[in-house]
Amino acid sequence: MNIILLGPPGAGKGTQAKKIAMRYGIPHISTGDMLREAVAAGTELGKKVKEIIEKGLLVPDDLMVAIVEDRLKKPDSAKGFILDGFPRTVQQAESLSGILGNLGKELDAVILIDAPEEVVVERISSRRVCPSCGKVYNLLTIKPKNDMLCDDCNIGLIQREDDKPATVRERYRVYMEKTAPVINYYSEHGSLITIDGSLDIEAVTEEIFKNLENL
């Protein structure tokens, strides 16, 4: 099954992608994770990505398309995939269509997990990360056992620059400006499924599986 997950940052795409991946035995391909790995590696590409992310801007289309194309060519994507965080522009959506055509694949579903700005800001600004092992916590839902310390490393947790409220609001603004047209693009192609992302995690999962089983 070939699936795209759309929605604003903080809507819960990553959480739901992992559940779908486990159920259908397909890889969860998160462009966000791939970009953060580049930043952590400290390469020239990573430095460029870091600067873009910290400003709350979108990574250029040509860079994202190249990253995704390479990933979809890997053997574990042969039976399907879940794309989380891509496409974010209509140009990326059109490029993806070309990539899939070349690989002999078609999209089965485009799932939009929608959530309002205030929900997004509250969720993301509550995230904390261990600078050593990279484990992610949330002060609302996945709290550390000891106040502001990693359960595994006992090191003080930090707030990533792109998780701070001002940056989150800018990311949401950019999302609405750039990604909303992608929703219209897939809506016109008849493959869009909209889910209320302000619901709790279990309710969102139930709605997603209900829709996928009816395809």
From Swiss-Prot:
Gene3D superfamilies: P-loop containing nucleotide triphosphate hydrolases (3.40.50.300). Keywords: ATP-binding, Cytoplasm, Kinase, Metal-binding, Nucleotide biosynthesis, Nucleotide-binding, Transferase, Zinc. Pfam families: ADK, ADK_lid. Zn(2+) binds at residues 130, 133, 150, 153. One of its GO terms (biological process) is AMP salvage. One of its GO terms (molecular function) is adenylate kinase activity. AMP binds at residues 31, 36, 57-59, 85-88, 92, 160, 171. Residues 30-59 are annotated as: NMP. It catalyses: AMP + ATP = 2 ADP. It is found in: Cytoplasm. ATP binds at residues 10-15, 127, 136-137, 199. Its main location: cytoplasm. Its EC number is 2.7.4.3. It is an enzyme of class 2 (transferase). One of its GO terms (cellular component) is cytoplasm. Pathway: Purine metabolism; AMP biosynthesis via salvage pathway; AMP from ADP: step 1/1. Residues 126-163 are annotated as: LID. PROSITE patterns: ADENYLATE_KINASE. Consists of three domains, a large central CORE domain and two small peripheral domains, NMPbind and LID, which undergo movements during catalysis. The LID domain closes over the site of phosphoryl transfer upon ATP binding. Assembling and dissambling the active center during each catalytic cycle provides an effective means to prevent ATP hydrolysis. Some bacteria have evolved a zinc-coordinating structure that stabilizes the LID domain. Catalyzes the reversible transfer of the terminal phosphate group between ATP and AMP. Plays an important role in cellular energy homeostasis and in adenine nucleotide metabolism. Belongs to the adenylate kinase family. Monomer. This is Adenylate kinase. It comes from Kosmotoga olearia (strain ATCC BAA-1733 / DSM 21960 / TBF 19.5.1). The lineage of its organism: Bacteria, Thermotogati, Thermotogota, Thermotogae, Kosmotogales. The gene is adk.
